[in-house]
Design a protein with these regions (language model features):
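Alpha4 helix (beta4-alpha4-beta5 surface) of REC/receiver domains from two-component response regulators
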Residues: 65, 86-101
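Active-site beta3 strand of CheY-like receiver
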Residues: 48-53
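Acidic catalytic/metal-coordinating carboxylates
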Residues: 35-39, 62-65
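Active-site residues of response regulator receiver
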Residues: 55, 83
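A Lys-centered signature of the CheY-like receiver
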Residues: 105
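Two-component/phosphorelay signaling modules centered on CheY-like receiver
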Residues: 14-32
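Feature captures the catalytic ectodomains and active-site-proximal regions of enzymes
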Residues: 13, 22-23, 57, 92, ...
């Protein structure tokens, strides 16, 4: 029989526990016994036990002191205290010493077995169950993908994939990871076809208010209409999997509801984030704001420098002329700390709008800085880094303040990103935009099947800046290279996180609507 773990059982009346020991041994556990804390401490130093079962009332060294000695030798050993004492001070002391379970005698063999099983076999049971459930879901997803006809159905399918990705962060079975990666890639191919076939209709259909320009109106405006205050947070370039990875933590602070929106094409800040703050499509935006047109024409870096003005105009168009608004863009750590220290000063406003660039900076810098390449080698590393940032940065302090305030909170992103692997050669003149996953300019061309070519931008509510003006969008995990600099840029871009094109990760973006738990 396969040994499931080596347990040391410490009890001065161990002779009375022989039936329990035999029961555990029959279940596959190896049991070593000790009748006092001193002997147990020696045995613990000579053996690597997987679990300790411990009584409190023993002659000489009592259970709590024995626990401290055991933990001083190996801090991570799990311990179950099994004792007759029901004193609350003992329970508190055991908990403070990071005991794993507390059982009160008398206990049946099955009770002890279940406690041991939960600690020693939990990971294997979860892994086996996860594997079995995914293989069943794999078949369902493969069948569903052929019948998807709406964005809602794509969103539900994408959520399934993302939830499996997060569950697999705890798995060691790399083959299962690879199956999921292949399935996600196939779903992206089908999603790209859906977008090519339906995007033009989606942007022209007023009955589909799920695109970037409708985000504020759909999710923040209702709170203002009801006389409430709103903190509207856009975390640039944050992906769905990253939102879901922080969801449990957010639930510890807020009541959370999740919705979604579809990022505009190109999935780039200058298009999608401007659309969120202005409530307008890109072609409408440059007509209303000529200076935005000038920024596009000159390929300026500050293509989002008018967001505060756009948001104020949108709020007024929606009928809230009297609302006091504070807009704040955070692009560096020190700026975030300054905002966090002043957050209470802004709570008198009706609307706090916050733009955070940290996740976008991670995406772009991870291909340039060796330390970040180590931290973010893949999507899982990216998720863990973002989750750690949320829990340990100035942003966590802001969230805690908001959870205790009278603000409704909306968190979303303008677009996501995707890890790119396949280069596409593209021909363009020197005036073309320099995006890695999208390009716009005069007479752009590529014959690659992983490119969506838009020769009629007006039908897609995209701006036109001259004759023969068109757009190229990379699909799936592709990226653009110019032939004359292909090798130099391929080394930099291969396996990096980019955005601007068509993929589930870039286009399907969560919207989290949150209220403090105390409200």
């Amino acid at each position: 029989m396969e040994r499931k773990g080596h347990i040391i059982w410490i009890d001065d009346e161990i002779h009375h526990l022989k039936p329990h020991i035999l029961f555990l041994e029959a279940k596959g556990y190896k049991i070593t016994t000790a009748t006092n804390g001193s002997d147990a401490n020696i045995l613990n130093q000579e053996n690597r036990f997987d679990l300790a079962l411990l009584d409190q009332n023993m002659p000489g060294i009592d259970g709590i002191d024995t626990l401290k000695k055991i933990k001083s030798h190996r801090q991570t050993i799990p311990v179950i205290m099994i004792t007759k004492s029901e004193d609350e001070w003992l329970m508190d002391e055991a908990i403070s010493q990071q005991i794993d379970q507390f059982l009160i005698k008398p206990v049946s063999p099955n009770q002890i077995y279940m406690a041991c099983k939960q600690i020693l076999e939990k990971n294997k049971i979860i892994e086996d169950k996860t594997t079995s459930e995914y293989l069943q879901d794999f078949q369902r997803i493969n069948q569903d993908i052929n019948f998807i006809k709406s964005l809602d159905e794509w969103w539900q399918l994408f959520l399934s994939l993302v939830n499996w990705q997060i569950k697999f962060d705890m798995q060691v079975d790399s083959n299962l990871h690879n199956i999921l990666i292949d399935q996600t890639n196939e779903c992206n191919k089908q999603f790209s076809k859906y977008v090519e076939d339906n995007y033009e209709t989606l942007v022209s259909d007023n009955k589909t208010p799920i695109l970037s320009p409708s985000v504020f109106k759909n999710h923040a405006q209702p709170s203002l209409d009801n006389g409430k205050k709103v903190c509207f947070i856009v975390i640039d370039c944050m992906r769905c999997d990253q939102f879901l990875s922080i969801y449990p933590y957010l639930e510890s602070l807020f009541q959370v509801e999740m919705f979604y929106h579809l990022s505009l094409l190109p999935t780039a800040t200058s298009f999608s984030r401007n659309a969120i703050f202005s409530g307008l499509f890109p072609d409408e935006m440059i007509k209303k704001y000529p200076k935005q047109r000038d920024s596009f024409l000159h390929n300026e870096n500050g293509l989002n420098k008018y967001e505060e003005e756009y948001l104020n105009d949108q709020i007024k168009r929606l009928g809230n002329n009297d609302k006091k608004v504070h807009y704040h863009k955070i692009w560096a750590l020190e700026e975030g700390k300054r905002f966090s220290k002043k957050i209470n000063n802004y709570l008198e406003k009706d609307v706090i709008a916050l733009v955070i660039n940290f996740v976008d900076m991670l995406a772009h810098d991870s291909s340039k800085i060796d330390v970040l390449k180590e931290l973010i080698p893949d999507e899982s590393g990216y998720r863990k880094t973002v989750r750690s940032w949320v829990k340990n940065s100035w942003f966590n302090d802001v969230l805690k303040v908001l959870s205790q305030s009278n603000f409704d909170v909306v968190i979303t992103s303008d677009h996501g990103s995707i890890k790119v692997n396949k280069e596409i050669m593209v021909s363009a003149d020197k005036d073309a935009s320099d995006g890695v996953r999208y390009k716009y300019g005069r007479n752009l061309n590529s014959k690659n099947k992983n490119v969506m070519k838009i020769n009629n931008p007006e039908n897609f509510k995209l701006p036109i800046f001259g004759p023969q003006f068109n757009y190229l969008l990379a699909k799936n995990d592709s990226y653009f290279l110019y032939p004359n600099a292909a090798n130099r840029y391929k080394n930099k871009l291969q396996n990096s996180f980019q955005h601007g094109g068509i993929s589930l990760e870039e286009m399907l973006i969560p919207v989290l609507k949150m209220k403090g738990i105390s409200k």
